[in-house]
């Protein structure tokens, strides 16, 4: 090894990444290469837009699970001209070899699997801190944490009392990180907020946050709701969860699903996919729902629709997928049968009241798998500490379905960055013709061939031959 003179070493900037092991980069690169073959939408966008660089000048702060599939998304954004900084949106979802591969390519990445809450918020701050002292001008979010950090931080600049009463462990870490940053730079967040041209949001929970800000008149920039693109919600949420839920449960527990009684709480698109996956492996599946329409859908599919408090003692596998909080509360947890498996596939960890279990005896079996002894003497198996089981205990959705979602993300970033001045400070969805384009880009990969309308047929149903084929109000 050649020694670096002290004078030279002092001039070297610290690495613009935090990853578990940069030596995993080669492994990550091999998996990225395989994933690219399963992500035709993203690869098509590289071909279509690579020469024109529609994202040149975009500074994208990305907060989304740092997986292999996300690596393909990041490199697509870079290929289209963007400058990108990235953190994960979940403390357990990072694939360390993926983070290493992207960091080794020169993209600043701040993500490790199993990071602490303090580290999580420190890393989220890092994606907002451009090396030249500048700021991001775009946010690509999953769950709304990056957007929420900017918004809460800007409020705290003028009223620090918003940080006085954290409601849980997560908020304690978040509020402390904001106080630390404000002590260093009292206008950090408002400066970033004023420079953001737009936000694209990946998931149901983050979209709900955006609509809340819009309703209260607090949304300071336009946002695109990627989640409600048909080629996202009806594919990622449904078919992705149909494969990744049981992958996470089985990797974590090696349990035989056949013959078990499972309860899926929430029968939206995520719940529908989750229920199908468990039924497909032979479980008896029940559904808990608050929405009469979703409940009726579940009943018509042959599922028993039940109340949690009436069946809790009979269930072997609990899955929350509601986007709400304290869906499974302490009063339910303490009544569970011995060796019941408890997990969540909604975005945040508060669907299950994990905090109420902290004083009980915990035995860690392996990463993200804990045995908890209840007052009754029964033990339950908690997966991923109540966070996303498919990413905490497995590797998330398959590449092909994520290509649908991430193609929407790239199109949304291009739209807001290049045409942001045409958008008011509201939440939008991508137009139907782009939704259909995303679907078209994925058909050839799976050998699907579209039938084409004749002009007479198109005229008869009053649609263009090339689409769009459905009105915006159509429910797929």
UniProtKB/Swiss-Prot annotation:
Pfam family membership, one: AdoHcyase
UniProt keyword terms in alphabetical order: Cytoplasm, Hydrolase, NAD, One-carbon metabolism
Top-level taxon: Bacteria
CC cofactor note: Binds 1 NAD(+) per subunit.
Chief localization: cytoplasm
Cofactor: NAD(+)
CDD domains: SAHH (cd00401)
Subcellular location: Cytoplasm
Pathway assignment: Amino-acid biosynthesis; L-homocysteine biosynthesis; L-homocysteine from S-adenosyl-L-homocysteine: step 1/1
GO CC, one annotated term: cytosol
One record GO biological process: S-adenosylmethionine cycle
Gene3D superfamilies, per the entry: Adenosylhomocysteinase-like, NAD(P)-binding Rossmann-like Domain
Molecular-function annotations in GO: adenosylhomocysteinase activity
Transmembrane segments: none
Top EC class of this enzyme: hydrolase
EC number(s) from the headed UniProt entry: 3.13.2.1
InterPro entries assigned to the protein according to its UniProt record, in alphabetical order: Adenosylhomocyst_ase-like_sf, Adenosylhomocysteinase-like, Ado_hCys_hydrolase_NAD-bd, NAD(P)-bd_dom_sf, S-Ado-L-homoCys_hydrolase_CS
Binding sites annotated in the UniProt record for substrate: 67, 142, 202, 232, 236
Record field: catalytic activity: S-adenosyl-L-homocysteine + H2O = L-homocysteine + adenosine
Chain residues that bind NAD(+): 203-205, 237, 266-271, 289, 324, 345-347, 390
Annotated HAMAP family: AdoHcyase (MF_00563)
Protein's job: May play a key role in the regulation of the intracellular concentration of adenosylhomocysteine.
NCBIfam families to which the protein is assigned, alphabetical: ahcY, PRK05476.2-3
Protein family (similarity comment): Belongs to the adenosylhomocysteinase family.
Protein name: Adenosylhomocysteinase
